Amino acid sequence: MCHNKSSAPPTPAHISIQQNRTPGTDPVPYLHASSDTGSGDTIVLLTDIFGVTPFYRHLAAMLAEKGHDVVIPDVFHRVGHATDPGRDAALARRRQLDDRLAIEDIERTVAHTVDDQQTFGVLGFCLGGSFALLTAAAHPNQVTATYYAFPKGAPGAKVPVKPPLEAADAIDGPVLCHWGRDDYIDHEEIDQLEQILASAPGPSEIRWYDNAGHSFLAGLTEPNHPSTAAAHDSWQRTVEFFERYLTVGSAN
């Protein structure tokens, strides 16, 4: 499971979250979160198969409070909303997704919201984590953080794309990846990805968390969650990662 039911506190009054679209005849809907105190660099947040849930709006607001502009493209906009908030409906919608078009939508969102050559961040979860690693291979100015990404690609696509394992050796920018030891994703695949990233041009770090499974970041907003410690530690590292690489203005 990912973050379809994770709790989310109310958005602070000084944080604006608005619905926008990219220009053109086939616009991509996206949410834009920013602070009324002003924002600087851009972080593109890529969700899991449940799409833009309240939990991701909350993460966007938290990053906006740190001074980032945050955009969340809706890569499922061609498929439509899930019939209900459950896992089966999300998986059914996943099976209708053309991953090639999803990547194109992410690229168009980046082109519309990020200045040419500007260093920008991408934060991806599950399916979105796999997409984040793929776009990182195409953008040397991308700073990438992921949670529970699938090294061989998230299963079930109507039209798949090549997996991160086949693209990671071309990643120039810094990468930070988080997984829980109890995640159902094959650990050998993650080890393969770590080896490839270690030989890639950009710096990389793989973080493992004990007693944490898939979607362990839910502990960030749920005090009694079994992975609360892992969630808070990983989030602090993610925030510091973006502050370090986005603040200096260079992904290298």
From Swiss-Prot:
Pathway: Aromatic compound metabolism; 3-chlorocatechol degradation. One of its GO terms (biological process) is catabolic process. It comes from the Bacteria. Keywords: Aromatic hydrocarbons catabolism, Hydrolase, Serine esterase. The keyword Lipid biosynthesis does not apply. Gene3D superfamilies: alpha/beta hydrolase. Residues 1-28 are annotated as: Disordered. Its EC number is 3.1.1.45. It catalyses: 2-(5-oxo-2,5-dihydrofuran-2-ylidene)acetate + H2O = 4-oxohex-2-enedioate + H(+). The active site is at 126, 183, 214. The keyword Flavoprotein does not apply. InterPro entries: AB_hydrolase_fold, Dienelactn_hydro, Dienelactone_hydrolase-like. Coiled coil: none annotated. GO terms for molecular function: carboxymethylenebutenolidase activity. Belongs to the dienelactone hydrolase family. Ring cleavage of cyclic ester dienelactone to produce maleylacetate. This is Carboxymethylenebutenolidase. The lineage of its organism: Bacteria, Bacillati, Actinomycetota, Actinomycetes, Mycobacteriales.
